[in-house]
Curated annotation (Swiss-Prot):
Keywords: Cytoplasm, Glycolysis, Lyase, Magnesium, Metal-binding, Secreted. The keyword Cytoplasm applies. This is Enolase. It comes from Pseudomonas savastanoi pv. phaseolicola (strain 1448A / Race 6) (Pseudomonas syringae pv. phaseolicola (strain 1448A / Race 6)). Pathway: Carbohydrate degradation; glycolysis; pyruvate from D-glyceraldehyde 3-phosphate: step 4/5. One of its GO terms (molecular function) is magnesium ion binding. Binds a second Mg(2+) ion via substrate during catalysis. Mg(2+) binds at residues 246, 288, 315. The gene is eno. It is found in: Cytoplasm; Secreted; Cell surface. Catalyzes the reversible conversion of 2-phosphoglycerate (2-PG) into phosphoenolpyruvate (PEP). It is essential for the degradation of carbohydrates via glycolysis. The active site is at 209 (proton donor), 340 (proton acceptor).
Amino acid sequence: MAKIVDIKGREVLDSRGNPTVEADVVLDNGIVGSACAPSGASTGSREALELRDGDKSRYMGKGVLKAVANINGPIRDLLLGKDPVDQKALDHAMIKLDGTENKASLGANAILAVSLAAAKAAAQDQDLPLYAHIANLNGTPGVYSMPVPMMNIINGGEHADNNIDIQEFMIQPVGAKTFAEGLRWGTEIFHHLKAVLKARGLNTAVGDEGGFAPNLASNKEALDAIAEAVANAGYTLGTDVTLALDCAASEFYKNGKYKLSEEGEYSSAEFAEYLAELTRKHPIISIEDGLDESDWDGWKVLTDKIGEKVQLVGDDLFVTNTKILKEGIDKKIANSILIKFNQIGSLTETLEAIQMAKAAGYTAIISHRSGETEDSTIADLAVGTSAGQIKTGSLCRSDRVSKYNQLLRIEEQLGSKAAYRGRAEFRG
C-alpha cells in the first residue's frame, strides 16, 4: 500500500487571471498527483466557501495564500501516512478537521484541490486511468459512457460584458454517433456562428467560457442567430442539434420580480410561462436555473408546467449539496442537478450528489466553472460516473478545450466500451 509522504499547495492563476489553489499529493513511491480548484462568477448563496485572503494589496484581495497555508500546514499534517486510495477517509478527515458546514475554516478550494490531487495520485498508483479509478470510487467499476457536450456558444449575464440577460445559450449534438463526431459538429456550428454575427455587424469577442458575447436586441435574437448557424453548417435543428439555456435567473431577480433588460418585468408564474413559450417555439430541451434559487414556489410552477418534457437543471438551486437536493427531490422541484466540484468541496461529496440524483431519476450534468484552469478532471468524472452530459464551455480557449481534448483521448481508449447516447440522455 502506497502512503502519502508530502502535500504541497501553491497559488496559481485561473482563466480570468485570478488566483486559485493548486495542490500536489506525493506518494512514497514517487508518484505525484496534481489538481487545481476552479472558481465561479455567478454563484449560489449556499455554496461551500472559497477562501480568499482579502488583502487588497495583493491581487485586489483575491489572493489564496490562506488556503495554500492550510494545505501546507494542517491538511498536510493530517494526511501524511494515509492511503491515497481510500478517498472517503481522506475527504471525511479534512471535512472533520474543518468543522464548519460550508468549509469556511480551511476553505473549500484548499480541501478540493487536495481531494482531487489525491485521487489522481491513487489512480496512478493503481496504474488506472483517472476515469477508471473514479468509477471504482462510484461503485460502478468498468461502467462508462461518453457525455453529450452542452456547448456554450453565446455568453451573456455574468459571463460577458454585454446586454444579454440569459447567461448561456448552448447547443447539444444529440444526433451524433460518437463524442468525437458531436465535437466536430459543435465546432463547425461555432465557426458558422462567428460568420453569422459578423454578417450582422456584431462583435465576435468571446466571454469567460469562450462563447461569443455580442450585444443583441433580445434573447430571441441569440436563438435566431444560433438557428442560422446550425443550418449554415448543414445540420438540422431539433434532430441533429438541440438547444439549452442557462438563465442564471438569480442574477436578474430583484424584489420578487424577474427583470429582463429588453423584454420587461415578470412575476414567477409569468417568467415560467415565458420559458415555456421559448420551449414551444425553439427545440430547447434543457433549462438551467430558470428561476431564482430562493423561489421554490416558482420552481414548482415551472416543473409542473414543462418538467415532463424539458430537463430543468438546478445549479444555484442545489449547489451540489445532497441536503438541498433531497429537499428538492421530496418537493418534486426540478429534475436535474448541475454538478460542480467546488460548490461542495470534495470528490466524495460530489459522487454522493450524483448517486442521489440518479437514484431519484434526476439527471446529473458535470460542469466546469467560469474561472477554470488546464485541469481536465471533470472529463474523467463525466465518463467515470456515466453522467451522460457535460458542460465545459465553447469551442475556443484552452481552459475549455482541454476538457474536450481529454474526452477525445478517453473515447479513443475505451472505444465501444463507452457509448455516446445522444438524445437518450435527455427527457422528452
